From Swiss-Prot:
This is Methylenetetrahydrofolate reductase (NADPH). Allosterically regulated by S-adenosylmethionine (SAM). Contains a serine-rich phosphorylation region at the N-terminal and an eukaryote-only S-adenosylmethionine (SAM)-binding domain at the C-terminal. Through asymmetric homodimerization, the two regions are positioned next to each other and N-terminal phosphorylation increases sensitivity to SAM binding and inhibition. Catalyzes the conversion of 5,10-methylenetetrahydrofolate to 5-methyltetrahydrofolate, a cosubstrate for homocysteine remethylation to methionine. Represents a key regulatory connection between the folate and methionine cycles. Keywords: Allosteric enzyme, FAD, Flavoprotein, NADP, Oxidoreductase, Phosphoprotein. It catalyses: (6S)-5-methyl-5,6,7,8-tetrahydrofolate + NADP(+) = (6R)-5,10-methylene-5,6,7,8-tetrahydrofolate + NADPH + H(+). It is an enzyme of class 1 (oxidoreductase). The modification Phosphoserine is found at residues 10, 18-20, 22, 24-25, 28-29, 102, 393.
């Protein structure tokens, strides 16, 4: 019977075996569904060519691997913030001393992999042939391919001492590395090489260095990024010289916004460049004033970039960030190249891994934890496209590694305690944390709550459409971790709820997901009888005992869009089977990210443990999206029933 409520133990979903997101991913996906974002299907060199043909200038960013695990967490946060500005790609340098090809969280390979898979950034991995045998390089390239990296910057690398000594049987020049990549991997990788506007410091002459650059391009390099320089005329002369010897691939200027006296000296020493005297004259008197130097560096970089862009010779700008963001962001904003409000291709964060290019459907439960979803589905061979399909046994990997640097909270323990409470005295203390997260107001100790275990980011813009309702229910112990308002045919360009191409319309069913007590659930089930034909619900405890009225455990589309010349796209679903995988993660976060802040057996730890053990996870969907959402009334009716005398209520335990 449709909408017949039923309870069960656990649907016994399995976490290993199948490698797709549904029982038969080939049957349930339609790979012919037109892509909402053509760039997802293009190689980097194709994106560049399309931008060059249209005259649409771009920017890109360089980062280096951090030295510590904490630095890795901070760098991933920086990736996420800078991704909002719309870089065409980022690149990650290769540090031989840091075991760059390993699986360490601070290695070049892992940082680049994280940028691609978990931050959705087109990424170039630097690779050097210095002190590496060809078989080692081949191994690194195979690993890069496996991790979803499709772009390599081929470099010779710097010698450990003062003089270059080739590895026995190894390569002596970047040209050799480019040839090796093309021989072993054909056209799989897009290859970038370095250009030196004043010539490489080890080259016999500028002309000799240009000859080597031409050899790298002839061997298969797709584009060039230059070393930093300080005057536009230096770059113009370099491009002219390249053109004269037949180099026709894109040449991107390397831009270094001066951010401090010490960092400038170090970079100049490494690159063996001479700083123009007019720049020295400005910097020397203010060398101890970091703010003044940074402001001057921004002004200088903006002026240089404008001259480059106005020349018509520059398709894009490549920034050496030194893992800092303020100066580069300010330069890009002043140039008008920073995208303040980027158009979302889909309502959730994308991965740039090639095998996920067709993916356009996900369960809503991971909306605020996209990195976790990507991690748990990383072993799938295919991804749902067009519709979620009959998901009778999705193979979600188990999430036990909460310590992984790309899944950890961006806030250190001390900050989390200030936000969530040095000491909890009751369940109501927990309610207050949720309330302050939603309100944005400081807590009783004067600290703002900027994250929760289930959401490490600021509130989504659409939350503002139901902020007062959310505040009201959280004060009552409806601890919301995910929600969306109902939307009926809003333009896809809407700044709050829009997504997808221009000219479309987006729709949403109201959705509410929360933790609450057993007593509240018992009253809620009584109230839901009145809304049986309108509201779908799924209620589960930490042990997996659950009750739902989802018809035949079928997925329910809760977000969809209609766009010119395309089929309906439904990128977000409420899938009852996937919910049972999500509930394990959702409950575990109480302990892993909140409870473990406190000493074992402490009152604060015991309060979190009690909620983990006794509360239920609930999701509600209001199917009547054209009408005002009834979910708030459902909650109000629930508490009205709770406030009656017990003899007036008929209870039904789940």
């Amino acid at each position: 019977m449709v909408n017949e409520a039923r309870g069960s133990g656990s649907p016994n979903p399995r976490s290993e075996g199948s490698s797709s997101g549904s029982e038969s991913s080939k049957d349930s996906s339609r790979c012919s569904t037109p892509s909402l974002d053509p760039e997802r299907h293009e190689r980097l060199r194709e994106k560049m060519r399309r931008r060059m043909d249209s005259g649409d200038k771009w920017f890109s960013l360089e980062f280096f691997p951090p030295r510590t695990a904490e630095g890795a967490v901070n760098l991933i946060s920086r990736f996420d913030r800078m991704a909002a500005g719309g870089p065409l790609f980022v690149d990650v340098t290769w540090h031989p001393a840091g075991d760059p090809g390993s699986d360490k969280e601070t290695s070049s390979m892992m940082i680049a992999s994280t940028a691609v898979n978990y931050c959705g950034l087109e990424t170039i991995l630097h690779m050097t042939c210095c002190q590496q045998r060809p078989e080692e390089i081949t191994g690194h390239l195979h690993r890069a391919k496996q991790l979803g990296l499709k772009n390599i910057m081929a470099l010779r690398g710097d010698p450990v001492g003062d003089h270059w000594e080739a590895e026995e049987g190894g390569f002596s020049y970047a040209t050799d590395l480019v040839k090796h990549i093309r021989t072993e991997f054909a056209d799989y990788f897009d290859i970038c090489v370095a250009g030196y506007p004043r010539g490489h410091p080890d080259a016999e002459s500028f002309e000799d260095d240009l000859k080597h650059l031409k050899e790298k391009v002839s061997a298969g390099a797709d584009f060039i990024i230059t070393q930093l320089f300080f005057e536009a005329s230096t770059f113009f002369s370099f491009v002219k010289a390249c053109t004269e010897i037949g180099i026709s691939c894109p040449i991107l200027p390397g831009i270094f916004p001066i951010q401090g006296y010490t960092s400038l000296r170090q970079l100049v020493k490494l690159s063996k460049l001479e700083v123009p005297q007019k720049i020295k004259d400005v910097i020397e008197p203010i060398k101890d004033n970091d703010a003044a130097i940074r402001n001057y560096g921004i002004e200088l970089a903006v002026s240089l970039c404008r001259e480059l862009l106005d020349s018509g010779l520059v398709p894009g700008l490549h920034f050496y960030t030194l893992n800092r963001e303020v100066a580069t962001m300010e330069v890009l904003k002043q140039l008008g190249m920073w995208t303040e409000d980027p158009r979302r291709p889909l309502p959730w964060a994308l991965s740039a891994h090639p095998k996920r290019r067709e993916e356009d459907v996900r369960p809503i439960f991971w909306a605020s934890r996209p990195k976790s979803y990507i991690y748990r589905t990383q072993d799938w061979d295919e991804f749902p496209n067009g519709r979620w399909g009959n998901s009778s046994s999705p193979a979600f990997g188990e999430l036990k590694d909460y310590y992984l640097f790309y899944l950890k909270s961006k806030s250190p323990r001390e900050e989390l305690l200030k936000m969530w409470g040095e000491e909890l005295t009751s369940e109501e203390s927990v309610f207050e944390v949720f309330e302050h997260y939603l309100s944005g107001e400081p807590n009783r100790h004067g600290y703002r709550v900027t994250c929760l275990p289930w959401n490490d980011e600021p509130l989504a813009a659409e939350t503002s459409l139901m902020k007062e309702e959310l505040l009201r229910v959280n004060r009552l112990g409806i601890l919301t971790i995910n929600s969306q308002p109902n939307i009926n045919a809003k333009p896809s360009s809407d700044p709050v709820v829009g997504w997808g191409p221009s000219g479309g319309y987006v729709f949403q069913k109201a959705y509410l997901e929360f933790f609450t007590s057993r007593e509240t659930v018992e009253a809620l089930l009584q109230v839901l009888k009145t809304y049986e034909l309108r509201v779908n619900y799924h209620i589960v405890d930490v042990k997996g005992e659950n009750i739902t009225n989802a018809p035949e455990l079928q997925p329910n589309a809760v977000t969809w869009g209609i766009f010119p010349g395309r089929e309906i796209i439904q990128p977000t679903v409420v899938d009852p089977i996937s919910f049972m995988f999500w509930k394990d993660e959702a409950f575990a976060l109480w302990i892993e990210q909140w409870g473990k802040l406190y000493e074992e057996e402490s009152p604060s730890r015991m309060i979190i443990q009690y909620i983990h053990d006794n509360y239920f996870l609930v999701n509600l969907v209001d199917n009547e999206f054209p009408l005002d959402s009834c979910l708030w009334q459902v909650v109000e009716d629930t508490f009205e029933l709770l406030n009656r005398h017990p003899t007036e209520r008929e209870t039904q335990a789940p």
